[in-house]
Amino acid sequence: MKKVGIVVAALLCVALVCSGFYLAKNHAETHSGENVQLTKVQKIIMRDLENDYPATPREVVKFYNQIITVYYGEDYTDEEFSSLVLQARQVMDKELLENNPETDYKEAVRKDVANYKERSRTIRQTSVCDTNEVLYLTDKNNGDELAYVTASYFVQEKKKFDKTYQKYVLRKDDEGNWKILNYYQIEGSPSEEDDD
């Protein structure tokens, strides 16, 4: 009888160990398949612009607007801020980059963000003009392909709302990518498409 008890106890131990391994493996497989939600900051930082560069001038401005919205409206670490700056600079033309060295650009963004926060300003919505409103030109002097894209920004400052417009000038580079060459504030635009 004693031998039967030992055999039953041994079988019970083996069954418990096997059940434990099965449950642990099943739990790990279940959790490894879960989708991880990325923050807006992480989505921008993780975008591989080498292989997934925006195809049109509008898409470049939309991506840049996502970066701007994150600059002014999200929380991020210093490391994430540096990565955001690198992403923003990847959609800028070499001429714009030369005129705005990385350290100067970073400092200007930091100051502007601090000013926004001090004034309780928030970018509520960004919009980009319709595809048929993008103006394409060729520079007669050097043959550069240019595109002009209008964007609008709906900004809240405390309880006051304001809408501003910017014109982006983009130039096609040697790889065929549209890069932001310049941008400046303008008076209103007749129509836009929401980016949000």
List the predicted regions and their residue ranges.
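A mature extracytoplasmic/lumenal domain signature
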Residues: 103, 151-155, 168, 182-185
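Hydrophobic core residues within well-ordered beta-strands of beta-rich domains
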Residues: 60, 147, 164-166
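Amphipathic, hydrophobic N-terminal targeting peptides for secretion and organelle import
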Residues: 1-42, 195-196
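Surface-exposed, charged secondary-structure patches
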Residues: 109-157
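Core segments of small alpha/beta cavity-forming domains
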Residues: 40-120
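Short low-complexity stretches enriched in small and charged residues
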Residues: 18-23, 44, 99-106, 122-127, ...
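Short beta-strand edge/turn micro-motifs at domain boundaries
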Residues: 28-39, 161-196
